[in-house]
């Protein structure tokens, strides 16, 4: 069975409580909800673990839980992307990253490493942190976003959905 949290903690909590009432849960493959923030549902995961229900996290995980996880190396991927932009002679490189997912933090670390190695300045004004709701409709924060990246010659986007929206906004401008 597949459950979808839509990256909301309340939905995750409801799903976990429902699963704890069942006796037929053989295991779970989980993509963490708002994994870049403290999670109030960790105790529910601990109850599942006490019941010996196997958990495997993918893409991201909660460091407070000792569970196996499979993830991309988001820091290295962002590092390589920013290095590519630097090799193309960009110096004013900004980033649009998600603040509520663990991947956003990891991608930021890769961005920082590439910029620092190249001796380029990391400026807060070139960074835009968005949450899950904003990522679905960047138009809601259009003015703030465009003002922050106005001086940038290149941007690291959190993912392809963000990149697509950014391209459309910049073309309309």
PLM regions with names:
Residues 30-31:
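Core AdoMet radical
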């Amino acid at each position: 069975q597949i459950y979808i949290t839509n990256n909301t903690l309340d939905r995750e909590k409801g799903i976990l409580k429902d699963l704890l009432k069942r006796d037929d849960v053989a295991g779970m493959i989980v993509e963490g909800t708002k994994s870049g923030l403290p999670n109030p549902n960790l105790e529910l995961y601990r109850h599942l673990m006490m019941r010996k229900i196997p958990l495997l996290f993918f893409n991201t995980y909660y460091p407070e839980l000792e569970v196996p996880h499979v993830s991309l190396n988001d820091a290295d991927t962002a590092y390589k992307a920013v290095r590519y932009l630097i090799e193309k002679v960009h110096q004013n490189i900004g980033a649009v990253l998600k603040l509520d997912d663990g991947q956003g933090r990891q991608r930021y670390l890769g961005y920082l490493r590439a910029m620092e190695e190249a001796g380029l300045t990391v400026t807060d004004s070139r960074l835009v942190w968005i949450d899950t709701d904003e990522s679905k409709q960047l138009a809601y924060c259009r003015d703030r976003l465009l003002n922050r990246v106005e001086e940038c010659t290149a941007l690291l986007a959190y993912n392809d959905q963000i990149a697509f929206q950014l391209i459309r906004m910049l073309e309309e401008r």
